Every structure is written in C-alpha cells, then in structure tokens.
From Swiss-Prot:
The record marks 60 as: Reversibly protonated during proton transport. It is found in: Mitochondrion membrane. This protein is one of the chains of the nonenzymatic membrane component (F0) of mitochondrial ATPase. PROSITE patterns: ATPASE_C (PS00605). This is ATP synthase subunit 9, mitochondrial. GO terms for cellular component: mitochondrial membrane; proton-transporting ATP synthase complex; proton-transporting two-sector ATPase complex, proton-transporting domain.
Length: 76
C-alpha cells in the first residue's frame, strides 16, 4: 500500500473521531442535569432516570457512529 494513502487513512480516521469529544461533553450534561433534577424534585426519581438513560443511549449512538466511520476509513 502506498505510504501516502496509508497516512491519509490515518489522518481521516483521526479526524472521524473528533465527534467523540462532543459525546463526552453531552454525557456530562445529561448526568449533570439528572443530578440537578433530583435535587429539585426527588419524587420523580424513576421517571427522570428513564429519561436519562434514553438521553445517554442517544448520545452514545453518535459516538458509535463516529467510531464505526473511523474503523471503516482505517480498515478499507
């Protein structure tokens, strides 16, 4: 494989993982909001936890897509 092509793949895979930084911030915001909501209204604990898990799953889906794209760029 050409060295230029291999280095372009490495750079592309690295750039594809930039989306993971936003996911880390998003997960922090989701759970930070959960803590604030618990402090305001502890009686809604079960309902808020369900919404939090849903938000966490949707946020992590973005990370999985970015990681999948990085692997596709790197290994194809």
């Amino acid at each position: 494989m050409n060295v230029t092509l291999q280095s372009a793949k490495m750079i592309g895979a690295g750039l594809a993982t930039i989306g993971l930084t936003g996911v880390g911030a998003g997960v922090g915001i989701v759970f930070g909001s959960l803590v604030m909501a618990y402090a305001r209204n502890p009686s809604l604990k079960q309902q808020l936890f369900g919404y939090t898990i849903l938000g966490f799953a949707l946020t992590e889906a973005v990370a999985l897509f970015a990681l999948m794209m990085a692997f596709l760029i790197l290994f194809t």
